[in-house]
Amino acid sequence: MSSLPVAAVLPELLSALQHAPQVLLNAPTGAGKSTWLPLQILAEGNIAGRIILLEPRRLAARNVAQRLAELLGEKPGETVGFRMRAETCVGPQTRLEVVTEGILTRMIQRDPELTGVGLVILDEFHERSLQADLALALLLDVQQGLRDDLKLLIMSATLDNDRLQRLLPEAPVVVSEGRAYPVERRFSPLSAHQRFDEAVAVAVAELLRHEQGSMLLFLPGVGEIQRVLEQLTERVAEDVILCPLYGALPLSEQRKAILPAPAGKRKVVLATNIAETSLTIEGIRLVVDSAQERVARFDPRTGLTRLVTQRISQASMMQRAGRAGRLSPGICLHLLGKEQAERAAAQSEPEILHSDLSALLLELLQWGCHDPAALAWLDQPPAVNLAAARRLLEALSALDGERLSAFGRKMAALGNEPRLAAMLAAAQTDDEAVTAAKLAAILEEPPRGGLVDLGAVFSRQQANWQQRSQQLMKRLARRGGQPDAGLMAGLLASAFADRIARRRGQEGRYQLANGMGAMLDADDALGRHEWLIAPLLLQGSASPDARMLLALPVEIGELIAARPELAKSSDTVEWDEAQGTLKAWRRTVIGQLVIKTQPLAKPSEAELHQAMLNGIREKGLGVLNWTPEAEQLRLRLHCAAQWLPEEAWPAVDDASLLASLETWLLPQMNGVHSLRTLKALDLRQALQDWLPWPLRQKLDRELPTHYTVPTGSRLAIRYHAENPPALAVRMQEMFGEATTPVFAEGRVPLVLELLSPAQRPLQITCDLSAFWQGSYREVQKEMKGRYPKHVWPDDPANAAPTRRSKKYS
């Protein structure tokens, strides 16, 4: 084993770990960094405490743990153990734990000091998964504030060293050149005249006919794997075994794919990018690369994820090609042109830039971090995705202002995705808890095969769901209870209320409570139900409507009876412009779905006024009578908040005024019963009465409506939301004014638009003194010739102002 490439840099690495808190290791696939190096660090690294090795994928974690234990002549659970979702194999003597990403985050949250841990190794960091970025940010925070003795080793096959070194400028970089056999890289675009699955199968069969050895075929997703597998069944020889490999396969099936082919056989492993790194698949010397991958991209506008098929990066192509040279010289056939490959992005985009960040935000708030920018990230989480995450957590009642609510803390402690955590935390009885646990297990690993009816799926017994359900029950500290299908709708509604759906028309089309559209296949039996709740949705690329992947029929009356907080009643108003009247209605809604509408026959004045306010909020402030005087007062208040921020000026933007109608408009509405009388309201008076007397006085003093110029003329000042105040005045009327007037306690100069006798602009200035002493001379010279009957003195700052020409002066 010492012949492994990474062995050559072991002394350098061990020295770096002794002298630096963070170390970067760049070692290509097959160098031994996952399956050999951790044992050497354990034996020779003088690490004070356990070692945690993070592997992104469950299959890789299990295999790495198995391999490391075998090298010690042991079984997992002794010196080497592993932890992953729904399965733990560690013992009292375990000193090296291989864990998956979510597990590491939970360990840090439960014990921020990582008591008893001396080193954390982040493997395959180049994949830049969301959880790996979060783990790095948390670990750096732990090192800085709690454990300056904790060591961190970041290792990868294609480290983005420049970015990491900017983040960790003091970290030593250890580079292992690796040992790969030569790989012949071929490039051949697929035929445009064949279906993708058929064209891939033809290319694979052709390569198998001319070359020996087993093959690894990279495809973007499960659908392509299944279709290409069908095509290959008829095209390959009898000695070829076809093995699918993707993350949703049961681990037992995944392990079959990576075992050596039986004697006299060879195999084709049809894999997603799960096989790019970590996994060693025995006997592979041929790789066919579709050069495509399927990526989940979150849409913060809809709150849904869309699966996008895209070209892989050049780094991923290199990784895939490298799989052909692990054991002997090999061949990699890329199914695209060489020029196309050279135009591909150099590196894959990190998950944090295009993912749903609600789970990350929940973790950060549990950590006590209210501003993500306070942590060290390779890429800052996008603000728009964080805003969408915050909206979801608010809808789930997880927040109390900027912090987690008591319910949010209960959610965070469970360690599940936020919606599932909310559903689990909402369970009150043992029966509800076990029902929620089974639902969560199903939604984490949904069945394949196209069955959408969640009720039918729930009735199934599946070992992985049962195992996961039991683990979740332990987290909830619950025992006993029986799964009850009758509780499903209420539990789902506690986390997916925005995905309650009502049928619209035929052919499986529905509207969701969040206003979006959703659909089933036209022949799906669920389509006969008027109401569904669809916890699992996927945003399609061909239609604006989301596709329901799992949905449950609900009786809406029973659901509201079980969860009355879902339904909101509101009084709204309809404007009858022709009659000048208002019609008030009471609507009962779930989100944007109207359950019931009833007229308010004889509403009281208070009810009618509230309905009017709701109508104004619905239609906007434009339905009110904004006179120039009212608009000017609103602008002055806006400017006062900017120029005199130390005072508590009321906010007058649209959103704030709509939110505070009861405070400033309602007191003026006595006797208002119709649209005509509503539009007659004096909004200037309403806003002025809203101001406390001291602020009203200060506004009139510091931001006056008019300014009296030297001639005595009282001229209106123009206020603007983004610019200083302005005054248009004939230049002769400003003679004798030496300096520019200032407002807002001397902080804001008045912009003077100095006009000719014909009221045309001559000069715009906010420094009158400089103008009189400077460019006025040129204006004077020109104006004397054009307006000889008017006064153009040599010393305007001290001259007498006038409204008239020389004849009348």
What are these regions (language model features)?
Residues L520-D521, W585, I717-R718:
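Short capping micro-motif at the N-terminus of alpha-helices
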Residues Y181, A518, R714-A716:
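Short, isolated positions in well-ordered beta-strands
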Residues I121-L122, V240-I241, P250, Q254, ...:
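Charge-dense polyanion-binding interfaces
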Residues L399, E432-G517, E530-H706, E745-S809:
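Acidic, serine/threonine- and proline-rich low-complexity intrinsically disordered segments
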Residues A686-V748:
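C-terminal accessory/binding modules appended to enzymatic or scaffolding proteins
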